[in-house]
């Protein structure tokens, strides 16, 4: 922490990635938007007392059971993801049902990415997100993640 002499505001210095805490969040039965906003808060560091908007001080998040996330209302049948191939007439639309079957991690990553800053800082924070299909996160046991009931 650094205290400036001309103001009462205390600013945090850039934190070291080695001291980053990791959290495990189970997406099973959770609503996509509510889950994504909680994950985005942790990635930004807003859960910390020393939160500073321009500093990458967030923690890492591992989301498991990505394929079991749910949507409310008729969105499961109506939600569509758009992407452009780069060719003429290359606009593609993929319904949520197909996307969750083919790439369940993309659904959560896309939602969280929309809730982070659209800057270098947001891209850096996205690197601390891991989304896994299934309930096993054995490859991340070495970092001793904390299981959240968020």
Swiss-Prot record:
Coiled coil: none
Record's signal peptide: none
InterPro entries in the cross-refs: Ribosomal_uL13, Ribosomal_uL13_bac-type, Ribosomal_uL13_CS, Ribosomal_uL13_sf
MF-aspect GO terms: mRNA binding; structural constituent of ribosome
Residues that span the membrane, as ranges: none
Sorted UniProt keywords: Ribonucleoprotein, Ribosomal protein
GO BP annotations, alphabetical order: negative regulation of translation; translation
UniProt keyword annotation of Nucleotide-binding present: no
GO cellular component, one term: ribosome
Keyword Acyltransferase attached: no
UniProt cross-references to PROSITE patterns, sorted A to Z: RIBOSOMAL_L13
Family annotation (NCBIfam families): rplM_bact
Entry's family note: Belongs to the universal ribosomal protein uL13 family.
Quaternary structure note: Part of the 50S ribosomal subunit.
Function field: This protein is one of the early assembly proteins of the 50S ribosomal subunit, although it is not seen to bind rRNA by itself. It is important during the early stages of 50S assembly.
Protein name: Large ribosomal subunit protein uL13
Upper lineage: Bacteria, Pseudomonadati, Chlamydiota, Chlamydiia, Chlamydiales
Gene name in the database record: rplM
């Amino acid at each position: 922490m650094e205290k400036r002499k001309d103001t009462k505001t205390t600013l945090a210095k850039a934190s070291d990635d080695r001291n980053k805490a990791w959290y495990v969040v189970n997406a099973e039965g959770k609503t996509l938007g509510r889950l994504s906003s909680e994950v985005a808060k942790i990635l930004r560091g807003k859960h910390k007392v020393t939160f500073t908007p321009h500093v990458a001080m967030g923690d890492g998040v591992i989301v498991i059971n990505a394929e079991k996330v749910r949507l409310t209302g008729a969105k499961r049948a109506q939600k569509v993801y758009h992407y452009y191939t780069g060719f003429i007439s290359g606009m593609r639309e993929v319904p949520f049902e197909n996307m969750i079957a083919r790439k369940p991690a993309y659904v959560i990553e896309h939602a969280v990415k929309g809730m982070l800053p659209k800057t270098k800082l947001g891209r850096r924070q996205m690197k601390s997100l891991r989304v896994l299909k299934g309930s096993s996160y054995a490859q991340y046991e070495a970092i001793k993640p904390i299981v959240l009931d968020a």
